[in-house]
């Protein structure tokens, strides 16, 4: 393991950073491939940003090149699978104390091998202080960037790219953190940066912002006066004192002046009438804790009132707070929130950011990378490699680390394609993908965390089995187990660590951890086999459907969709059956389905709609490979095509569980077209279009879809959206409101969830919705 020692005057010192307990080669990951650097040096903390390329394995599928063979007769799979190396881009952000600046620069210099850059962008007050040291150690020219410009660019970046970035802090609520959904238009807003002093900036667009005010009374005031009053020199220790203090012992309250008469003034007796008002007349010593608390209230109330006045003056209702004074400290966030609520009478929101400590570093990086146009891409937080928002409770997490900021590590992956809202969302600004917020529902949270823990052995076993020729598969799988288990324990004690905790985020985190240890598609061979078997049955299924009368066929098609959706390897109730009974197939799945009336049953309403004029274009979000896509979805697609309806079939861009991927759907469609003239003609005439969603998870976020898909939806005038599967239609989007008609259908394959919804295992949800006029 590489070591990194603090150095002072050339001699060794303590370990890298008390706040980072990971070994240096895990902190400075992919440093050897770093292409561009930026650094934000504050009064006590340094934030380093660098862009690197990451090489990892991806599973690729390719159709066999012998079309003359009869796919139904031969016993070979429908396509071949290969694992290839792929290079992607990643942003790394690291926070460490300035004490260890020289040691970290030495480590970076010793491990830089492939960098082409000759410049490092620098911002923050320390950019001047450490300029010569950085240039000497890294042999890179320091380009100093404007602090405020960097902060604004960084703030815009995280608000656009990271879901649940902003939150309100409500101390007496459960949960304390209320995360905001991503708003499609983040402008305008007020940014209040509380460093040594206070800067207040109105941000109107990506490039237009204006410094509109500020104050000399800020974090430096709290630190300086606090040190004089308490003899405590460390900022974090001062805040700890404040958290234990009672300000009413030092402050003069309204009730101290007016007694019971304060009610006639319409004021609360507990309001502060005079900060430190009792200290002039009291004949006793005050505790350090009480003085620190009084000082914190005085400064926070002043900043809150100032921010509120500027927000009102400029007609703004969103105020984001950042700077070293905040840094995720609950006592600070609580006092600022109270102040904003009081002075604005609840009309202005005080919002904080999960990554506010990195805004300057992100902005400096973006300034240096303008020629690469990083804003043309979408970026996603990598949960496997990032630290979480720190606990406000006593430290319970297995990974012990002292508080020195909101984050220790942050990594963001560049996504292949830009992501946008589905144009058919009724109101993108109020859209919430997830049905249940597990940070808000303690019972559901404990159940799902336990559920994912108990499933871990099976995931590890499947990962190892997917790479039988790899000599280190078992070792990597064990590392995956340890990392994901650690994430689950963190989330047990800090459910807000990565924003709103949901089933979707638990699944995403698991996929990120699998990819981290080069298990890109553990179910690739399962999907290959099931696709091959289902293709052999396709013609018999369509012949059976064609023999039915119209009304009988519509119900059979829906039951086929539902039966296909049973085949979900992510559901333990199903995977147990599939592993114990290899003969379990399409007909057996139909018999598992709940009899009508279903748990949610809009089928009669749907049938009545089918008797009317046909839709123009249907957008279908498919779920699983094998029987689901081939015997459930494609016959349904075929029926829509026969009605003259165009179809856009959207599948995941990358693998997760046994969900069908876009590349697999292309091969499946090609094989089906060779057997079915309706599908063949529709593909040739572009009436059936296969597209990728732009994402990989088993759930579906309609606010982050491939831009090409959104363009196609507009061009084709889609007026029906079909979402199938538990992940896409129950865990997410169950309450999603669209501008057009929608079908949400799934089989509930989890007994606990089914009971909670008022049903039983294999209950059916068939939800047909028409938008209100």
Curated annotation (Swiss-Prot):
Record bears the keyword ATP-binding: yes
Alphabetically ordered keywords of this record: Acetylation, ATP-binding, Coenzyme A biosynthesis, Cytoplasm, Hydrolase, Manganese, Metal-binding, Nickel, Nitration, Nucleotide-binding, Phosphoprotein
GO terms for biological process, alphabetical: coenzyme A biosynthetic process
UniProt-annotated stretches for the region Pantothenate kinase: 2-402
Ligand binding (Mn(2+)): 623-624, 659
UniProt short sequence motif Subfamily II EGMGR motif, positions renumbered to this chain: 724-728
Description of what induces expression: By glucose.
Domain of life: Eukaryota
Subcellular location, principal: cytoplasm
Modification 3'-nitrotyrosine, positions: 320
Cofactor requirement: Mn(2+); Ni(2+)
Region of interest (4'-phosphopantetheine phosphatase), residue spans: 403-773
GO MF annotation: an example: phosphatase activity
Listed EC numbers: 3.1.3.-
One matching Pfam family: Fumble
Top enzyme category: hydrolase
Summary of activators and inhibitors of this protein: Activity is strongly promoted by Co(2+), Ni(2+), Mg(2+) and Mn(2+). Activity is inhibited by EDTA.
PANTHER family with a match to the protein in the record: 4'-PHOSPHOPANTETHEINE PHOSPHATASE, PANTOTHENATE KINASE
Family: In the N-terminal section; belongs to the type II pantothenate kinase family.
Purpose of the protein: Phosphatase which shows a preference for 4'-phosphopantetheine and its oxidatively damaged forms (sulfonate or S-sulfonate), providing strong indirect evidence that the phosphatase activity pre-empts damage in the coenzyme A (CoA) pathway. Hydrolyzing excess 4'-phosphopantetheine could constitute a directed overflow mechanism to prevent its oxidation to the S-sulfonate, sulfonate, or other forms. Hydrolyzing 4'-phosphopantetheine sulfonate or S-sulfonate would forestall their conversion to inactive forms of CoA and acyl carrier protein.
Quaternary organization: Homodimer. Interacts with PKM.
Protein name: 4'-phosphopantetheine phosphatase
Organism: Rattus norvegicus
